[in-house]
């Protein structure tokens, strides 16, 4: 019985013979169709072929009655993907290929091929209904992706363009409780990454912008939501293309890789270049070294119940060739993945961070590119939740936000490394020791978590920074390392007793455990250096923004000034009320008749600012009302009030109306004349006393500068408050924080704390920021 009769009896189309001839002679009937081998196979060929490791996961279907195979030469009308490719209409018995009507007309309509015998396939009603259902499903999927649009997620400066989780979910256009995975793509610029995503996920729609121009059309990181596969698709900027902020853009790629569940590395080259393996190897090393720890910290900090970094993402290397064979074609016994691992080992790169690495290649004889194999591989990996499970969009945003906050900031040009795609300098702190030049080994922005700078190497001494630290020798011998500093007095001494002891026996070194271990003038002669007797010296690193370590903490002079100032201020505050009352009464007694009495002036007549007890009230010489200093700072002659031709203080309103002559009656002029002489005498006395006070203030300022501790910022350099940025004036006094030495206003430095590290063992003025620091200052 012939093979044709056997097939007809089974209800199959005639001509469905094995197309592989791997274990048979090609005369056995076809039982299976392998979509990835693109052939019909008999029982023996199917078993022998798919016993190989690289072919083991191919999708095969068993042929049913009335089965019609796909057309062999084409991938469907207009080169569409296999999801909508054409079924064959005939089979050429001479060429032994299946042809659709279009391919038959194109290839067998002329020449000798016209005479080739053909067998017509009969399409059953069952097959027609199945194809109709497939087309309906395909149409539904296309319709689901019609409204998808991409949006800029992160710009080229590493700044996230989404404000919060709600904004991220709104732009993705997905449900807040939707569980999804993240698929991102990487590759060199111009290799068609955006084009690949458009055809793999969105049926060729230009969701991600593509351009035939030389300039890259993808700048930054763009994202879109695929409702069919329920994944967030991320398009990235190409490698080897950026010329500005290259280091920051490269670092941005690793942030995207860290939040991805599946990574596609797209390469359009006849052979796999070393750049691919170096990129993946360096990315793996940087991921394990810097990002795994941060992702775990984010999980704990945000209270997430999803492990973000159990294993890194899976990687698919999508390799498109034109003139060369695909990887592994000349070694059928070896899987392409094994050959890729060998390449990694030869280059000394070990991609341990990735959960798996897969190879998917396609050879494009004639455009367009076939993305069907890539799509099938992606769908298989997306269904696998063993290592990476889907998660809420909010979790994805939190992870990206945490990585962006942690690893941000400019990367200096001198720290750019060309031997690695992701050098440590992209992710570690950029601070350098001012003394030895060693770099900090901690991650970027570690100061926000209260972690101090650290270096791998020891520092060297620099006289400029005096980077020595004293530690108690006795405590060190007992296994403890306790830092000590020279200071004016012991913590057990009262402020005045400490000053007296300092004048007699000099500065002290006090250990919290051992007490006072050294006094500089304890004996009349023969006092030894503390380094030779009671302390050890260590050389430490000097980081930008920190002070030197053994600056002069002898603040005896400043303590004396603070004490005198405190007593003077106390007396002044106690006598402020009576003094002001007496002054106001005397002023009213000698004031002209048209002046409003001080007791009736509660606020400025122009700006309505209420006067405090110690505020000065000024009278306008023209109208006699009470004003603050800023509303009565102008001067002009007021001869109509008897002040003569000399300019005197007037308010802003009277100054603006200086061309209008006041109508003063003769009786008023006589009354004012009597009291005006007394007021002029009073002002002359007041101005004389003010000049004396100013003359005293100048040497007093010199005394303050001389008594100022070394770490205090000089008064003449302090122009505004270090915290609130208010400019200092006559009314706004400057105050030094005893911890950091910066200048502050009273509101920003009204707290009091002991600062032992600066020699202040009793509560003294500290700024708002220093007061928030935990532990001893």
Curated annotation (Swiss-Prot):
One of its GO terms (biological process) is positive regulation by host of viral genome replication. Keywords: Endoplasmic reticulum, Golgi apparatus, Lipid droplet, Metal-binding, Mitochondrion, Repeat, Zinc, Zinc-finger. It comes from the Eukaryota. Residues 416-777 are annotated as: Required for localization in the lipid droplets. CDD domains: Bbox1_ZFYVE1_rpt1, Bbox1_ZFYVE1_rpt2, FYVE_ZFYV1, GBP. One of its GO terms (cellular component) is endoplasmic reticulum membrane. A zinc finger (FYVE-type) spans 598-659, 715-775. Zn(2+) 2 binds at residues 620, 623, 651, 654. PROSITE patterns: ZF_FYVE. Zn(2+) 1 binds at residues 604, 607, 628, 631. Pfam families: ANCHR-like_BBOX, FYVE. Zn(2+) 3 binds at residues 721, 724, 745, 748. It is found in: Golgi apparatus; Golgi apparatus, Golgi stack; Endoplasmic reticulum; Preautophagosomal structure. Interacts with RAB18 (in GTP-bound form). Interacts with BSCL2 in a RAB18-dependent manner. Interacts with ZW10. Plays a role in the formation of lipid droplets (LDs) which are storage organelles at the center of lipid and energy homeostasis. Regulates the morphology, size and distribution of LDs. Mediates the formation of endoplasmic reticulum-lipid droplets (ER-LD) contact sites by forming a complex with RAB18 and ZW10. Binds to phosphatidylinositol 3-phosphate (PtdIns3P) through FYVE-type zinc finger. This is Zinc finger FYVE domain-containing protein 1. It comes from Mus musculus (Mouse).
